[in-house]
Amino acid sequence: MQRSKIKVEIKRLSHGEDLSLPCYATTQSAGMDLYAALNDSAVLNPLERLLVPTGIVIAIPNGFEGQIRPRSGLAAKHGITVLNSPGTIDSDYRGEVKICLINLSNQPYEIKRGDRIAQILISPVSQVIWDDREEFCAEETGRNAGGFGSSGR
């Protein structure tokens, strides 16, 4: 099956000119890797968070969003993840893409310039029109209001 493709404008900022553009690691990858545009390496201590610049500005088309997600290897091997995962980049945002990382391990982790720190997915979005009602006539489901572990372990 052929994947749909959309064109997204991107600009490298001066502190990111030498870094790769976000790219897919494989032909079937859903997300593109984002790179740390740090001037110097930074140590992320346990339970510390850090806003890491990527050195890029993007113009996501209306009707789409950028989803910022952790890289699975960083999370599994080092406990480094995206704090507000998934982060959202709205189509009207025109500032630098920055990644809020947190170290959930008990060991310091060094982030170096050019490290792959997160992934971005460009995904379609819909906007909701609420149907505000006094009488709520939603059909019964097997779950109803059950949540927070109600479906078992």
Swiss-Prot record:
Q: What does this protein do?
A: This enzyme is involved in nucleotide metabolism: it produces dUMP, the immediate precursor of thymidine nucleotides and it decreases the intracellular concentration of dUTP so that uracil cannot be incorporated into DNA.
Give the NCBIfam families listed for this entry: dut, PRK00601.1
Q: Which Pfam families match?
A: dUTPase
Q: Which cofactor does it need?
A: Mg(2+)
| E.C. number | 3.6.1.23
Q: Which organism is this entry from?
A: Wolbachia pipientis wMel
Protein known as = Deoxyuridine 5'-triphosphate nucleotidohydrolase
What GO biological process terms are annotated to this protein in UniProt? dUMP biosynthetic process; dUTP catabolic process
PANTHER family, alphabetically?
Answer: DEOXYURIDINE 5'-TRIPHOSPHATE NUCLEOTIDOHYDROLASE (PTHR11241:SF0)
Report keywords, A-Z. Hydrolase, Magnesium, Metal-binding, Nucleotide metabolism
The residues that hold substrate are 71-73, 84, 88-90, 98
The molecular function GO annotations come to: dUTP diphosphatase activity; magnesium ion binding
Q: Which family does it belong to?
A: Belongs to the dUTPase family.
> Which reactions is this enzyme annotated as catalysing?
dUTP + H2O = dUMP + diphosphate + H(+)
Biological pathway? Pyrimidine metabolism; dUMP biosynthesis; dUMP from dCTP (dUTP route): step 2/2
Q: What start and end residues bound the annotated signal peptide?
A: none
Membrane-spanning residues: none
